[in-house]
Design a protein with these regions (language model features):
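Intrinsically disordered and other compositionally biased segments
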Residues: 1, 13-16, 46
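Short, solvent-exposed loop/hinge segments that bridge or flank secondary-structure elements
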Residues: 21-73, 132-135
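General N-terminal targeting signals
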Residues: 51, 55-57, 83, 91-93, ...
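C-terminal motif of bacterial Sec signal peptides marking the signal peptidase cleavage site
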Residues: 3-6
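Sequence contexts marking disulfide-bonded cysteines in secreted/extracellular proteins
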Residues: 8, 59-61, 142-144
Length: 147
């Protein structure tokens, strides 16, 4: 969409392009599907995937808890933040699902993409290259229910 604004006092015209926001795409994965207790580990080298999954499974001794937020999101940590906050699951083209702050489009620089999810194991990659270089690819392995 192109919007034209005219300035009557100077006689000049300025064109402003307003980006069109398409309809919001629902996420392929629902917040309720990722809530619960997870073992968590990360890797930088793809060859370390299986070893890291085993480490994540062992991480259930000190599980990372993903809870439902008060407005339908999930409570998780943003990079470099001590306190967890409510984040949104956002849908993207190609049936992708992202986790990130509300109010930002899916696939934004603060988002992480769920690259794999089978209900038991979830693989997540940060989109910001600098953050990804520090945190690596995260693997969450669902922990058994407490006895």
């Amino acid at each position: 969409m192109l919007a034209l604004a005219a300035c009557a006092s100077s006689g000049t015209q300025q064109a402003t392009v307003q980006p069109g926001l398409g309809p919001e795409i629902p996420p392929a994965i629902k917040p309720q599907e990722i809530t619960g207790r997870w073992g968590l580990a990360a890797f930088h080298n793809p060859q370390d995937l299986k070893r890291t999954e085993t480490a994540a499974r062992n991480g259930c001794k000190q599980a990372y808890n993903i809870a439902m937020g008060p407005t339908g999101g999930v409570i998780m940590h943003m990079p470099d933040k001590a306190q967890p906050e409510e984040l949104r699951l956002k849908g993207g083209p190609g049936n992708k699902t992202f986790i990130g702050p509300q109010g930002e489009p899916a696939g934004g620089p603060q988002d992480r993409e769920i690259t794999s999810f089978d209900g038991r194991v979830m693989t997540v990659k940060f989109l910001d290259p600098e953050v990804s270089s520090r945190y690596g690819t995260q693997i969450y392995v669902r922990c058994a229910p407490r006895a």
